[in-house]
A protein has these predicted regions:
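Extended, well-ordered alpha-helical scaffold segments
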Residues: 81, 135-151, 207-227, 296, ...
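Well-ordered alpha-helical scaffold segments within catalytic/enzyme domains
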Residues: 61-74, 122-135, 193-208, 287-306, ...
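Bacterial Sec-dependent N-terminal signal peptides
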Residues: 1-25
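Extended ligand-binding clefts on enzyme/binding-domain cores
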Residues: 117, 153-157, 161-164, 170-179, ...
Length: 489
């Protein structure tokens, strides 16, 4: 991923937040990574939201929720951060319009002006629960779903798209690039997030109008792509190479990646971090595919009465689930039976976790496994320990990172996932306090921060993590944990 004029983007984001920032930036060429080494604090807790006239989208229902939650929270910094973070996707990344008489919403990931299927599906997710209270919000969400289906039908192998046939920074990649694509990294979860979003939108609003011919084409393409990437026959439906200094931005073996044994699992050439997989059966993403396919089958049966496609979804979900039970576990000497992060069907296992969702830690958050599943609980203990090579602990906090940013950089997303999947109030409290204490005084979440210095962080404007933080706080309030939040000092 390339972000031109990246230092200017950081400055612009800082101005958008109403902050004065001095920073020395470390830039990785053709990557979105910026490490800002110092952020200056402003007085008190003045809102860092854009001025009302500069907000891209405003929802009355969201504003009502912000006021409600702020009144309940006595921790002023937490209330301030919630107000900054929860509407961040709406106010800074949502480009809503009407195309051919139907809602159409293009969602930037933040500092990169492209739409990731994963990020966009996660960014607007917490607003679905409010859609029945706000017709305009409902239309905006409908527009995201329709845009995602269109993107899938342009190319189901792509992870990120342009707003129009503009071309972009990665047109020279050795893969079947198109001008509509920002990037063409094959990641299973890119096709799962739209299914998760559309299903929940339907359940919350009762609106089935999005499941039209575009939807049928999209789910047909999703099934075709998943089956191709089981690699039971041809292995070259998808190839990817890039001239780069980052080993995880390209695939070995002439663009095919490491070999797999066709045991029923689905290849994911890249992770949700956009880094290449080591062993190409990415376990959390295969679990996500199972739950997403079952949601699609329910839609196809109930709304479309398309029993043929529904059965294909169900059959594939069962095949992948059976293969996961057989090949995705590992008998760890310390933790017992756990899920591996990646496998290849030949008996090899990669034992680690990455912060990006879907992750092993996040499987219970996504609903892919039961939170009380003993294998999941063993895995959860493993990934939040020094036995996970990408778990870092320092003076500022502890959590999971990944090779996308590298050593000692903790992703707040992992701390949020620990809180989302926790059944222990003290653990939840510790996670929220850590998130409050590692914002570097900005009032926002960042992509990652250094384990010993939260002012050393990457990406000043990363809407997914901001909205996810808002989702977490809203969930805790709605579950009656306001007193727990207010006990945080």
């Amino acid at each position: 991923m390339k972000n031109k004029n990246i230092s200017l983007c950081v400055i612009a984001a800082a101005l958008l937040m109403g902050k004065s920032v001095k920073a020395t930036d470390f830039v990785i060429v053709k990557d979105n990574t910026v490490i800002a080494n110092q952020a200056c604090l402003t007085a008190a807790y003045k809102t860092n939201r854009p001025p009302v006239k500069k907000r891209l989208f405003t929802s009355k229902a969201v504003e009502t929720e912000i006021l409600r939650v702020k009144k309940l929270l006595t921790n002023q910094k937490l209330a301030w951060m919630f107000e900054n973070c929860f509407p961040n996707t709406l106010e800074t990344t949502v480009h809503y319009r009407t195309t051919d008489g139907k809602p159409d919403t293009f969602v930037y990931t933040g500092d990169i002006h492209a739409m990731w299927l994963r990020d966009s599906g996660a960014q607007v997710w917490p607003y679905i629960q409010l859609a029945h209270k706000d017709p305009e919000l409902k239309k905006m969400l409908e527009g995201v779903i329709r845009r995602q289906f269109k993107c899938i039908n342009i190319d189901p192998y792509a992870n990120a798209f342009n707003d129009g046939a503009k071309g972009g920074d990665w047109m020279s990649d050795l893969t079947d690039m198109k001008p509509e694509l920002h990037e063409r990294k094959w990641e299973i979860d890119s096709l799962c997030y739209p299914l998760r979003l559309a299903y929940q939108y339907w359940k919350e609003t009762g609106d089935a109008s999005v499941f039209d011919s575009e939807w049928i084409q999209a789910i047909t393409n999703i099934l075709k792509t998943f089956k191709e990437q089981q690699r039971k026959g041809r292995v070259d439906y998808y190839k990817f190479q890039r001239k780069t200094e980052r080993a995880l931005d390209t695939l070995n073996n002439n663009g095919l990646g490491a070999p797999v044994n066709p045991v029923g699992l689905i290849v994911s050439c890249f992770r949700p971090s956009d880094d290449a997989t080591t062993l190409q059966f990415l376990v959390p993403s295969n679990f996500f595919a199972v739950s997403s396919l079952r949601k699609a089958a329910e839609i196809l049966t109930t709304v479309n009465q398309n029993t043929n496609l529904a059965q294909q979804c169900t059959d594939l979900a069962e095949e992948v689930e059976t293969a996961l039970q057989k090949y995705a576990t590992y008998n760890h000497p310390k933790y017992g039976t756990i899920y591996a992060f990646e496998v290849d069907g030949f008996g090899n296992h990669l034992l680690m976790d990455d912060a990006n969702v879907p992750s092993l830690l996040a499987m219970a958050y996504l609903g892919d496994v039961d939170i009380n599943n003993p294998i999941y609980q063993n895995t959860r203990r493993f990934v939040w320990s020094k036995d996970n090579p990408y778990f870092f602990k320092g003076k500022a906090g502890e959590g999971i990172g990944g090779p996308h940013i590298g050593y000692d950089m903790i992703w707040p997303m992992s701390i949020m996932m620990k809180a989302f999947t926790s059944q222990d109030d003290e653990e939840i409290k510790d996670c929220v306090k850590m998130l409050i204490d590692t914002d570097a005084g900005t009032g926002f979440m960042h992509e990652s921060f250094h384990k010993d210095d939260p002012a050393n962080f990457t990406r000043a404007w990363f809407a997914w993590q901001n909205t996810l933080f808002g989702e977490l706080i809203l969930k805790l309030v709605n579950e009656g944990k306001t007193d727990l939040l207010n006990s945080i000092q």
